[in-house]
Amino acid sequence: MEEGSSSPVSPVDSLGTSEEELERQPKRFGRKRRYSKKSSEDGSPTPGKRGKKGSPSAQSFEELQSQRILANVRERQRTQSLNEAFAALRKIIPTLPSDKLSKIQTLKLAARYIDFLYQVLQSDEMDNKMTSCSYVAHERLSYAYSVWRMEGAWSMSASH
């Protein structure tokens, strides 16, 4: 019986704390130690610094909060700008009425459209047909592109 009360393997120490609670405590204390090292340069707290530590941490929290708010505003503006750019790109690219393109599909389709236009220009240069880009020419290009796309060129590139 004496052996059971002095056993170092006991899950409860002399203060009545379980091993699980003891495992949690060093982690809790570890955080405090790391925080205190940041607040003092040499690791030893001084009475003057301890009194001032409360207000800078509150000010730091407010600063961090305002920085986070500003970052959120910037991110919202960036996202809005990106969405507007995609909307403009979707207006330029000829699409089918049933198309509801994601951003990646829009980019892939735009790249394919640019390639298509390049091929059209190359074939025009070979034929020495330098025509102006009128409304009718634009409509013909859109139609030709839609036909080209329906033939499977887009479906093959969408899988990549």
Swiss-Prot record:
GO terms for cellular component: cytoplasm; nucleoplasm; transcription regulator complex. It is found in: Nucleus; Cytoplasm. GO terms for biological process: cell population proliferation; cornea development in camera-type eye; embryonic cranial skeleton morphogenesis; face morphogenesis; keratinocyte proliferation; myeloid cell differentiation; negative regulation of cell population proliferation; negative regulation of DNA-templated transcription. Changing F86P: Abrogates transcriptional repression of MYOD1. Residues 66-117 form the bHLH domain. Gene3D superfamilies: Helix-loop-helix DNA-binding domain (4.10.280.10). Its main location: nucleus. Residues 27-37 have a biased composition (Basic residues). GO terms for molecular function: chromatin binding; DNA-binding transcription factor activity; protein dimerization activity; protein domain specific binding; RNA polymerase II transcription regulatory region sequence-specific DNA binding. The keyword Nucleus applies. It comes from the Eukaryota. Expressed at low levels in sclerotome and dermatome of somites, and in limb buds at 10.5 dpc. Accumulates predominantly in dermatome, prevertebrae and derivatives of branchial arches by 13 dpc. Also expressed near surface of embryo and in chondrogenic cells. In adult, expressed at low levels in skin, bladder, uterus, aorta and heart. Pfam families: HLH. Residues 1-63 are annotated as: Disordered. Induction: By TNF-alpha. Keywords: Cytoplasm, Developmental protein, Differentiation, DNA-binding, Nucleus, Repressor, Transcription, Transcription regulation. InterPro entries: bHLH_dom, E-box_TF_Regulators, HLH_DNA-bd_sf, Twist2_bHLH. PROSITE patterns: BHLH. SUPFAM superfamilies: HLH, helix-loop-helix DNA-binding domain. The C-terminal and HLH domains are essential for transcriptional repression. Efficient DNA binding requires dimerization with another bHLH protein. Forms a heterodimer with TCF3/E12. Also interacts with MEF2C. Binds to the E-box consensus sequence 5'-CANNTG-3' as a heterodimer and inhibits transcriptional activation by MYOD1, MYOG, MEF2A and MEF2C. Also represses expression of pro-inflammatory cytokines such as TNFA and IL1B. Involved in postnatal glycogen storage and energy metabolism. Inhibits the premature or ectopic differentiation of preosteoblast cells during osteogenesis, possibly by changing the internal signal transduction response of osteoblasts to external growth factors. PANTHER family: BASIC HELIX-LOOP-HELIX TRANSCRIPTION FACTOR, TWIST (PTHR23349), TWIST-RELATED PROTEIN 2 (PTHR23349:SF70). This is Twist-related protein 2. It comes from Mus musculus. The lineage of its organism: Eukaryota, Metazoa, Chordata, Craniata, Vertebrata.
